[in-house]
Amino acid sequence: MGLGKTLQLLALEVTERVEPAGPSLLLCPMSLVGNWQAEARKFAPDLRVYAHHGPQRLRGQDLTDQLARTDIVVTTYGTATRDLDELAEIDWNRVVLDEAQAIKNRHSRTAKAVGRLRGEHRVALTGTPVENRLGELWSIMDFLNPGLLGSAEKFRTRYAIPVERH
């Protein structure tokens, strides 16, 4: 909290928005959806934000129509996982993970789901990139740059085990 991640991302969205870029997809915990909406209204009022969550969320053609009028879609990790088949078909300008430690377990349903989301750019926001084990960093980095650090097992053998031993 208080690291300025929200404001930095909003500034990026405002300054890097080039038409005809599609919308960005921002995943966050449910407790932060309202905060993202409020901060966007306050600091980036020209950004068109759509909160995609809850039982009344749009699907199918209604969602497609909304996306044409939207710069940022804010949703929760749970909603994105449930709506994955539809969200994974969209070419997002940017896929952003707020509180990216939510994917620290590479075997989790959430981590596997976000890996299927297509975006021209990927951003991970977290104030706690490694809470317990170095392998958690691999999961976040593999979302950002798939394959850059090699397989999870190679990363574990080459880096995690030696570092965590000392």
Please report, for each region that a protein language model flagged, where it lies by residue.
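ASCE P-loop NTPase motor core, strongest for the SF2 helicase catalytic module
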Residues: 1-166
